[in-house]
Regions:
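N-terminal signal-anchor transmembrane segment
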Residues: 1-74, 98-105, 225
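Aromatic-anchored transmembrane helix interface
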Residues: 58-69, 85-104, 109-134
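Alpha-helical transmembrane segments of multi-pass inner-membrane proteins
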Residues: 143-169, 181-244
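A membrane-periplasm/extracellular boundary helix in multi-pass inner-membrane enzymes
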Residues: 218-222, 243-324
């Protein structure tokens, strides 16, 4: 069985890391072996243990996870948690499913394996929504689930510290217990697990909790992530000041002082964010934000995204008239999203491939050179700039992207706390439209937000009952 190894990273270190992650997973499974939902969530957080043994084992893992989700759904009788007002979730899931299979069957070339692997994650999300709702609202397991997620977050921190001790440098691809290829989760994990910590501690952090938060930032640092250094401090500020509705008292001042410290440490610890391009370089505000703008919008910047459309041209050669395809050029992740909204608003002509996509192989089985030649109206400067929104456009088209947005965002309208609702939607919007879209594509990330959602709803319901008495 071929192992999935990164040949630019020391192989003995990768094997040592794999053993360490596997041991951590087994330990967590043993601690929570009596609860099927806990076992499911732990396994969903440890895909790299199985992906390490090749694509075949990875596909087996995905099948097992779907079956285990179905088993827990039946075993926990999660269907009883359904309420008529949640019919929108099922309706939009049905709409998304019809568009997904219509595109996969008639407009794109996909293998059954890749269709299953992509669609199963959305099925798991729907099942997990009702499983977690039943566990928290009807079975009273909210505190237990928060404790479990807290421990899983601690496991990610320990694994990241061990990784840095083994390699003595940032390794982007090996991200905690989740990823072997691609480190984008190094941005998402700190954000989601901060929300878990905030809810678990009721917004009251001790010194150890702030240390835990620094550990989450280290998860991103060890994977060489830059975005988390900007986004996490903003998320921390929003939760303590806006979501919590706290007046600016003594505790809030401590929080306000800690947020800039997070940003300061992030800039100095991340080589690409300081002029010296080294760990613990100098703090240069202009340099850091200049890099961030170029990262999001390319060298053209935000203003350069407005006049970048190649019009059709005719070429006469050998008695034959040929036409160059029109291309809407886009630089960076922000540029990709701007270009997509131009297409959706009808500012530029579209082709059939724009509306129905080119299939999952075109996104996930192409190298950078092949990606540049895809017959789409939008031409991205390079594949690494593809946001979650743009990936939906490539694979299932503009129609599929619209259905994805409607389905995946509909969950958050059931959050009763208005401030928390808009904050969660804002985080998901940034992550899908301006980053990689890993929240919607990773069932356990959706599960984390479902725990936050249902636990918060339960707390609000309990407060209302107490007030009525």
């Amino acid at each position: 069985m071929p192992l999935e190894l990164l040949y630019n990273v020391p192989i003995p270190g990768q094997i040592l890391m794999q053993v360490f992650v596997a041991v951590a997973m087994v330990y967590m499974l043993y601690r929570h072996r009596r609860d099927a939902l806990s076992v499911l969530l732990i396994l969903l957080c440890c895909p790299r243990v199985f992906l390490f043994f090749g694509s075949t084992m990875g596909n087996v893992y995905k099948v097992v996870m779907l079956l285990l989700c179905g088993y827990v759904f039946v075993q926990q009788r999660a269907a009883v948690a359904y309420q008529r007002k949640e019919g929108w979730i099922l309706l939009l899931f049905a709409l998304f499913s019809m568009e997904f299979f219509w595109t996969a069957a008639y407009y794109t070339q996909n293998t059954l394996t890749i269709i299953f692997s992509q669609y199963s994650r959305y099925v798991e999300a729907v099942l997990l929504y009702f499983i977690i709702k039943k566990a928290i609202v009807m079975d009273g397991k909210g505190d237990r689930l928060l404790r479990l997620l807290y421990e899983i977050g601690l496991m990610q921190i320990i694994i990241s510290v061990f990784k840095f001790a083994v390699f003595r440098e940032q390794v982007e691809s090996l991200c905690a217990s989740f990823s072997i290829y691609g480190g984008d989760m190094g941005t998402t994990i700190p954000i989601l697990w901060f929300i878990v910590l905030w809810l678990y501690r009721k917004g009251q952090f001790s010194k150890l909790d702030w240390l835990y938060l620094l550990g989450l930032l280290f998860v991103g640092f060890s994977s060489g992530k830059r975005a988390v250094m900007f986004i996490l401090p903003i998320v921390v500020f929003v939760f303590f000041v806006y979501v919590q509705g706290r007046k600016v008292g003594k505790y809030a001042l401590y929080v306000l002082a800690f947020v800039p410290l997070l940003f300061y440490l992030g800039v100095r610890l991340t080589p690409t964010l300081n002029p010296e391009n080294q760990v613990w370089g100098s703090f240069d505000w202009d340099y850091a934000f200049g890099y961030a703008e170029e990262y999001q919008f390319g060298k053209k910047g935000i203003d350069g995204q407005t006049a970048n459309f190649k019009t059709e041209q005719l070429q006469y050669s050998g008695g034959v008239i040929s036409t160059y395809n029109s291309k809407l050029e886009a630089d960076g992740r922000g540029g990709a999203t701007i270009a997509m909204f131009k297409l959706l608003l009808g500012m530029h002509p579209t082709a059939d491939s724009d509306w129905w996509g080119l299939g999952f192989n075109s996104m996930y089985s192409t190298d950078y050179a092949e990606f540049d030649k895809l017959p789409l109206t939008i031409q991205l400067n390079h594949k690494g700039s593809a946001t979650g929104f743009f990936q939906s456009y490539v694979t299932i088209g503009l129609a599929g992207a619209i259905c994805t947005v409607l389905f995946c965002f509909c969950f958050w309208f059931y959050i009763k706390n208005r401030r928390l609702r808009w904050t969660i939607m804002g985080i998901c919007a940034w992550e899908y439209f301006m980053y990689t879209g890993s929240i919607f594509r990773t069932p356990v990330f959706m599960a984390v937000l479902f725990v936050v959602m249902h636990y918060s709803n339960m707390e609000m319901q309990q407060k209302r009952r107490a007030q009525q008495r």
